[in-house]
């Protein structure tokens, strides 16, 4: 049986480093949430999209980690009204960077903590 550690619903090295740098004990587990449906819903605001993605990632692990606090995170990059998804290829990354270069854009970060399917805390940060 696992100790009741924080479960990080992510494989992100950056998110792992943040927890480690702050002395937080955790178990990292890839989420199994399909983001495509939410990302294709054009009625969601960028804030709501980011929050729902973070929540979905955490919720996808609730049955596997009963009585654990699970942290789901997401970040949305926004330039004017266009949302930039995480580039899956080097060419797409270069293209995105060339579009964003010199432009004022926003990063919207969402963090959702759940336990047994209940949201304990959520935060939305604009950078």
Feature locations, PLM:
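Cofactor-binding loop segments of dinucleotide-utilizing enzymes, especially the Rossmann-like FAD-
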Residues: 11, 31, 116
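Flexible, glycine-rich phosphate/dinucleotide-binding loops
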Residues: 15, 35, 120
